[in-house]
Amino acid sequence: MAAPVVTAPGRALLRAGAGRLLRGGVQELLRPRHEGNAPDLACNFSLSQNRGTVIVERWWKVPLAGEGRKPRLHRRHRVYKLVEDTKHRPKENLELILTQSVENVGVRGDLVSVKKSLGRNRLLPQGLAVYASPENKKLFEEEKLLRQEGKLEKIQTKAGEATVKFLKSCRLEVGMKNNVKWELNPEIVARHFFKNLGVVVAPHTLKLPEEPITRWGEYWCEVTVNGLDTVRVPMSVVNFEKPKTKRYKYWLAQQAAKAMAPTSPQI
């Protein structure tokens, strides 16, 4: 009895399976979220890379033919010389358009230039980006216009995501005097954000506890970034210490140097 012959799937079968996978999985990831009765945006992104072009010209020029006649081509007229090969031109980076927010890369709709290894091994297979073809650029421009009109859900910017990540690792210290009666308000907290952490925070984006803060202790404050993400930052209210001037620090350094200098014995 002859052994059964197992044949490997052909290119057509593999192409059909890949097409079903893209239609079922990746295309769903590329679809933006809408608000209310917003019009649906056609998100049939092009998932194929632009093919290069090879430009050639004839080595021997074809002589002009008579009116109404076709030019006579000989064997030498089928010899071509290469002018430009855009298909095999070396490219350092890969231009992609992000379909989702990617840490340290960008947000949806950003045109980024990344290494080929990052684009082909992570961004493209996971549906996080598509090739920056003219068709995809046009689709994202239409999506950007709809987002500006408020017909699509807002997304956080790259700077906003970096701010949120930074605030999650911060702790704010607010110094208040002990010789006057005081109550902490958003304006004071916003000034200390800029003074101590270097972050510009508008007072209307801050939220403090409902009970008035009139004593030293451990509290919290919430910061809303671009009206989308809210971060709770630990806050310590401590006694205010006046910063020492440069002159005072110089005098302290001189006193310390004198104390460390060896004294000569008296005769």
Swiss-Prot record:
The keyword Transit peptide applies. Residues 1-52 form a transit peptide. InterPro entries: MRP-L9_N, Ribosomal_bL9, Ribosomal_bL9/RNase_H1_N, Ribosomal_bL9_N, Ribosomal_bL9_N_sf, Ribosomal_bL9m_C. It comes from the Eukaryota. It is found in: Mitochondrion. One of its GO terms (molecular function) is RNA binding. GO terms for biological process: mitochondrial translation; translation. Pfam families: bL9m_N, Ribosomal_bL9m_C, Ribosomal_L9_N. SUPFAM superfamilies: L9 N-domain-like. Keywords: Mitochondrion, Ribonucleoprotein, Ribosomal protein, Transit peptide. GO terms for cellular component: mitochondrial inner membrane; mitochondrial large ribosomal subunit; mitochondrial ribosome; mitochondrion. Its main location: mitochondrion. Component of the mitochondrial large ribosomal subunit (mt-LSU). Mature mammalian 55S mitochondrial ribosomes consist of a small (28S) and a large (39S) subunit. The 28S small subunit contains a 12S ribosomal RNA (12S mt-rRNA) and 30 different proteins. The 39S large subunit contains a 16S rRNA (16S mt-rRNA), a copy of mitochondrial valine transfer RNA (mt-tRNA(Val)), which plays an integral structural role, and 52 different proteins. Belongs to the bacterial ribosomal protein bL9 family. This is Large ribosomal subunit protein bL9m. It comes from Homo sapiens. The lineage of its organism: Eukaryota, Metazoa, Chordata, Craniata, Vertebrata.
